[in-house]
């Protein structure tokens, strides 16, 4: 059996088309959705991510603002800039690209973003609201994964799901969203004693640790859905995920590739979150 491919590029194209239609409708009413992206320092990977986010905004009718600062920017100056953006009615989403230089407290920076503009879904108010099932914003990567399940009709209610990874950005919110959808969820991590014992029982496995080949074919239940959130490089420097794709695709029922799987969905859901913020702001101003 060869797994069916979950194509993140194709689904992203559909969802971005819908986002562009909503953006055009808002713009016609004088409320063009606006996203501000802040980059501090010269991390090459961060620069690529920011460029892709700005391009996605431009391609889909959003107003975008990029603030690029040297790594020497003070924490106080960054917090002051966030405060300005919080009060700017043209801006509906604020994103600070992580990681930040060591002298800046990323937790303090995230908490400085107004919860109603926290389109990454990282603010403690949104993280806490996710626990109740009613967040203003869901973190973009796990939100994108949920859209993949939905688009392919993958049943979550009653399913056994394993999330490998416990980060605040992917692992923990992914587990909460699966739980909210009715799955029975196990979170595995670096201290898990027998990872394979958990994954072999899982109908759904989400790998999100940033470690090559953390999941191999012998660890996967036949017919399971495998979502690869990892972004790594193989020995030849080629982009790869956390899953041994060549082996696992012969066992799984569904699988996401890297690249072209979860990655495009992350930026797409950032657009969706920004649109939802702009729609709320337009409704409040009406």
Swiss-Prot record:
NADP(+) binds at residues 165-167, 190. Pathway: One-carbon metabolism; tetrahydrofolate interconversion. Coiled coil: none annotated. GO terms for molecular function: methenyltetrahydrofolate cyclohydrolase activity; methylenetetrahydrofolate dehydrogenase (NADP+) activity. GO terms for biological process: L-histidine biosynthetic process; methionine biosynthetic process; purine nucleotide biosynthetic process; tetrahydrofolate interconversion. Homodimer. This is Bifunctional protein FolD. It comes from Burkholderia cenocepacia (strain ATCC BAA-245 / DSM 16553 / LMG 16656 / NCTC 13227 / J2315 / CF5610). The gene is folD.
């Amino acid at each position: 059996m060869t797994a069916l491919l979950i194509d993140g590029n194709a689904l992203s194209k559909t969802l971005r088309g819908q986002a562009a239609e909503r953006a055009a409708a808002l713009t016609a009413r004088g409320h063009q959705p606006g996203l501000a992206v802040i980059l501090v320092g010269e991390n090459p990977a961060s620069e690529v991510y920011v460029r892709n986010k700005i391009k996605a905004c431009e391609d889909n009718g959003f107003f975008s603002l990029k603030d690029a600062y040297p790594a020497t920017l003070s924490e106080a100056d960054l917090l002051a800039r966030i405060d300005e953006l919080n009060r700017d009615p043209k801006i509906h989403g604020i994103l600070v690209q992580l990681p930040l230089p060591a002298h800046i407290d990323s937790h303090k920076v995230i908490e400085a973003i107004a919860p109603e503009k926290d389109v990454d879904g990282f603010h403690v108010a949104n993280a806490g609201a996710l626990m109740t099932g009613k967040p203003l914003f869901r973190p973009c990567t796990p939100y994108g994964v949920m859209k993949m399940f939905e688009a392919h009709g993958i049943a979550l209610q009653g399913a056994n799901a394993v999330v490998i990874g416990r980060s605040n950005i992917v692992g923990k919110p992914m587990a909460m969203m699966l739980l909210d959808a009715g799955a029975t969820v196990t979170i595995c991590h670096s201290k898990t004693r027998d990872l394979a014992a958990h994954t072999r029982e899982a109908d759904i496995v989400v790998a999100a640790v940033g470690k090559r080949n953390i999941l191999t074919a012998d660890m996967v239940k036949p017919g399971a859905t495998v979502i690869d959130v990892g972004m790594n490089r193989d020995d030849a420097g080629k982009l790869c995920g956390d899953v041994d794709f060549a082996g696992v695709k012969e066992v799984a029922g569904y699988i996401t590739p890297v690249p072209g799987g979860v990655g495009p969905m992350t930026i797409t859901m950032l657009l969706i979150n920004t649109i939802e913020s702009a729609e709320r702001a337009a409704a409040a101003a009406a």
